[in-house]
């Protein structure tokens, strides 16, 4: 009976749908954690209620269990197992021994790919360790990722409609799929995967409105993204009131959207001269978009720290050199931002300017240790985490 319960429980967890409609893998950390807990609980129950079998069944090694679970959530754990042994199905043995053997195989199953466990996104809840994160964490991380690699687009559709959408495109690998799936879980959208890229797209108006509200709470920091956001907010509001006017303004100004003065113009323009659009309350509702190219030094530190994780996923590099002169750098074409980060981390190195890109690179052991401590506390979530672990092992 207990074996049937266990099989049903495992089947339920294995096929429990995640937010993207796919299924959770049996070997991700949370599922692994749940299975071990229930197996351990049932095993102890049987041992306590089958005293005749007590001498034939040793309790689970709790210290081994705890250390393994710490390893499953520990960002420093290594993949050290390659065998492909499966859970044994033993016949002619009592239920307690069956449960013990199943649990023992899971506890000692060296065939579980630890690298996969350490780099898989749990379904729903998170065990202690690298993946301990929640809704606000991923919202802040999303803004950093969007600042570094996102895009806000407006497209004309069938000559009489405008389409609005936000996009993040990352290299196609398991870790980047995981991070975008988590963003989808908290912020909606869709995931498209091809041979080279995994792409998160959101294009329905309701969720775009929610993201605009999110950017009010956790503001974009790069100048270009601020101006892209200002353009979509302006055109979208006008589009709701007068479709033809919005299309005309979009076609006229789409190549001028990075000009901060454009949004003052949208506020001050006499709309009665364009398509005879003059609702009495338009100017009251459309207060204009204020663009501040300077970066607010009063940002919440926790926000900036988590934002930086998202930013580094696309604009950071952990460099390993043969001469052991390793370094960490981040870059962008936004001088205001790079100087803000330079001051934020109190880095004295000079900026490098090359091909219209500002680069801040650190070699000194002092700065290397600062960033190791930082990324140990604030954990990277995508493929950059894999690069960081390799880099960290060489530098400690």
Curated annotation (Swiss-Prot):
- Please provide one cellular component term from the Gene Ontology annotations of this protein: mitochondrion
Name of protein: Probable intron-encoded endonuclease aI3
Query: Chief localization class?
Result: mitochondrion
Statement: the UniProt record of this protein carries the keyword Chloroplast? no
**InterPro entries in the cross-refs:** Homing_endonucl, LAGLIDADG_dom, LAGLIDADG_Endonuclease
Q: Where is the composition biased (Low complexity)?
A: 74-90
List the residue ranges of the region (Disordered).
51-90
Which miscellaneous remark does the UniProt record hold? Encoded within intron 3 of COX1.
Q: Which organism is it from?
A: Kluyveromyces lactis (strain ATCC 8585 / CBS 2359 / DSM 70799 / NBRC 1267 / NRRL Y-1140 / WM37) (Yeast)
Q: Which PANTHER family match?
A: INTRON-ENCODED ENDONUCLEASE AI3-RELATED
Task: Describe the family membership recorded for this protein in Swiss-Prot or TrEMBL.
Answer: Belongs to the LAGLIDADG endonuclease family.
Alphabetical GO biological process terms: intron homing
Q: What class of enzyme is it?
A: hydrolase
Pfam families documented for this protein: LAGLIDADG_1 (PF00961)
State its Enzyme Commission number(s). 3.1.-.-
Q: What does this protein do?
A: Mitochondrial DNA endonuclease involved in intron homing.
């Amino acid at each position: 009976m207990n074996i049937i319960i266990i099989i049903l429980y495992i089947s339920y967890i294995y096929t429990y749908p995640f937010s993207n409609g796919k299924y959770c893998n049996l070997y991700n950390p949370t599922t692994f954690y749940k299975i071990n807990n229930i197996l351990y609980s049932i095993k102890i129950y049987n041992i306590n209620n089958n005293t005749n079998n007590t001498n034939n069944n040793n309790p689970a090694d709790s210290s081994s269990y705890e250390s393994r679970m710490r390893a499953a959530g520990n960002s420093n754990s290594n993949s050290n197992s390659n065998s492909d042994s499966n859970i044994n199905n033993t016949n002619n043995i009592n239920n307690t021994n069956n449960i013990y053997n199943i649990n023992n195989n899971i506890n000692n199953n060296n065939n579980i790919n630890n690298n996969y466990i350490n780099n898989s996104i749990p379904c729903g809840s998170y065990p202690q360790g690298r993946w301990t994160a929640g809704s606000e964490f991923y919202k802040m991380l999303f803004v950093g990722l969007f600042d570094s690699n996102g895009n806000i687009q407006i497209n004309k559709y069938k000559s009489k409609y405008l389409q609005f959408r936000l996009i993040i495109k990352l290299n196609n690998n398991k870790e980047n799929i995981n991070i975008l799936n988590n963003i989808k879980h908290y912020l909606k959208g869709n995931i498209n995967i091809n041979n080279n890229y995994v792409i998160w797209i959101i294009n329905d108006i309701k969720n775009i409105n929610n993201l605009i509200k999110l950017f009010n709470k956790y503001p974009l920091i790069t100048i270009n993204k601020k101006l892209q956001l200002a353009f979509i907010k302006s055109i979208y509001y006008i589009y709701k009131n007068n479709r033809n006017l919005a299309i005309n303004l979009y076609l006229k100004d789409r190549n001028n959207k990075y000009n901060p003065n454009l949004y003052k113009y949208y506020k001050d323009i006499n709309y009665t001269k364009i398509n005879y659009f003059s609702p009495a309350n338009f100017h009251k509702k459309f207060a204009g978009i204020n663009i501040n190219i300077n970066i607010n030094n009063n940002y919440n530190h926790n926000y900036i720290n988590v934002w930086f994780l998202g930013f580094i996923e696309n604009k950071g590099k952990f460099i390993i050199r043969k001469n052991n002169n390793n370094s960490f750098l981040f870059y962008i074409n936004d001088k205001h931002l790079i100087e803000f980060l330079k001051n934020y981390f109190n880095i004295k190195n000079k900026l490098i300017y090359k091909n219209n890109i500002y680069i801040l690179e650190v070699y000194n052991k002092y700065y290397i240790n600062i960033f190791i401590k930082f990324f140990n506390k604030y954990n990277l979530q995508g493929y950059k985490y894999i690069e960081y672990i390799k880099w960290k092992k060489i530098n400690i």
